[in-house]
Amino acid sequence: MRLLHLDSSILTDTSVSRQLTAQVVQDLHAAIDDLHATYRDLAAVPIAHLSGAIAAGFRPLPQPASDAALVAEHALSEQLVDEFLASDIVVIGAPMYNFSVPTQLKAWIDRIAQPGRTFRYTANGPEGLAGGKQLIVASSRGGMYTQGPMASLDFQEAYLTATFGFLGVRDVHFVRAENQSRGPEPAAAALISAQASIADVVRSVGRGVAHARVEA
């Protein structure tokens, strides 16, 4: 059983999303015996943003790239998509930045959203090829976006749900800490609530993993 753990917050010790992913991963290891984890810190070791030359490597090239740096980028793209496809559980720390996801996380998504690998187009429309995974997103936001006047500005969780759904990942679980910029008391209460929700999320993921094993 393979786990892919990604953090994307530009903060370190004070990062709420990092606190949440750490607890999620710890609880997953406690609940699932044979769990082997791969970790990437997308902020500390950022992935280059997609360029035309990098994206060209998603398809067979007429002739191999000769530039060493570009060859390395093509190899990294393959490594990233292989890690994603091999994973049974994906845990992503995704704070909201300017109503969306960190640019570091977007760079990773742009590498793994590869035609023919994680999705394809058919006569009946697009088809995701990365199904069967359990995705847990540790979401931290400065305000309240699940309801109220700011809900229409949520291009973070909505984007992640749509993008991974397009890739075939339907089991998406959010561990959510809102109101992190609304003062110490609301922030602390929201974090405690998010931490308390992790146990239920881990149980749900465990059931999903067990069901997938039976089907396999």
Swiss-Prot record:
Gene3D superfamilies: 3.40.50.360. The lineage of its organism: Bacteria, Pseudomonadati, Pseudomonadota, Gammaproteobacteria, Lysobacterales. Belongs to the azoreductase type 1 family. Signal peptide: none annotated. It is an enzyme of class 1 (oxidoreductase). Pfam families: Flavodoxin_2. This is FMN-dependent NADH:quinone oxidoreductase 2. FMN binds at S9, S15, V16, S17, M96, Y97, N98, F99, S140, R141, G142, G143. Its cofactor is FMN. Keywords: Flavoprotein, FMN, NAD, Oxidoreductase.
